Design a protein with these regions (language model features):
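Class II aminoacyl-tRNA synthetase-like tRNA-binding/catalytic domains
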Residues: 6-203
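Short, Lys/Arg-enriched N-terminal segments with co-localized hydrophobic residues
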Residues: 1-4
Length: 203
């Protein structure tokens, strides 16, 4: 279940998570995505923000983001959808070699919770060991996992390349009706009433 929270009015993303690099240190950026995990260390909150490109670390301190945003940051849980505006900094301590953004972090100046989420039925992470029937039941969550997102990206790129090649060769893309036969033990036919022949249906 998703609960809509704050509005996106007047808000515009400047970068996707892994588009933020060391070249932007000192600059203000606005990033959006899902909370992968959030850790409250007492006075400072570390949040891993994830979008389809990867993960970036966000730091919340009340002295930087204000009492209101810090109070909201204390509520963050896995799969909350948030928007953060802040300043890019070199990561304090050792860099995380496992992340593309492992050498930097964003010190939050403001936070908007775009939607809240209940505890997900399985962790949204690569190589999930969750049973397939559970993943299929919550397919909209399963499609957020990095390995499936890569598959979607590859499919999109291949389809775009094929379409562009055919367009360059002078082909037209025309959406025609698809006629298929009924299959034994298949799904029930979807009946569409005919307006020209009352009482008859297309299947």
């Amino acid at each position: 279940r998703i609960i809509m929270a704050e509005s996106m009015a007047g808000l515009k993303r400047t970068h996707r998570c892994t588009e933020v690099t060391a070249a932007q240190i000192g600059e203000n950026v606005t990033v959006m995505g899902w909370v992968q995990k959030s850790r409250n260390k007492g006075g400072i909150i570390f949040t891993d923000l994830r979008d389809r490109t990867g993960i970036i670390q966000i730091i919340f301190e009340e002295s930087d983001c204000g009492a209101e945003s810090f109070a909201k940051a204390e509520r963050l849980r896995s799969e909350f959808t948030i928007a953060v505006t802040g300043v890019v900094e070199k990561r304090s301590g050792a860099a995380n070699e496992n992340l593309k953004t492992g050498s930097i972090e964003v010190r939050a100046k403001s936070l908007r919770i775009l939607s809240e989420s209940e505890v997900p039925p399985f962790p949204i992470e690569e190589n999930s060991k969750t049973r397939e029937e559970v993943r299929l039941k919550y397919r909209y969550l399963d499609l957020r996992r990095p390995d499936l997102q890569r598959n979607i990206l590859v499919r999109s790129r291949v389809a775009t390349m094929v379409r562009q090649f055919l367009a360059d060769e002078g082909f037209l893309e025309i959406e025609t009706p698809t006629l298929i036969k009924s299959t034994p033990e298949g799904a029930r036919d979807y009946l569409v009433p005919s307006r020209v022949h009352p009482g008859n249906f297309y299947a």
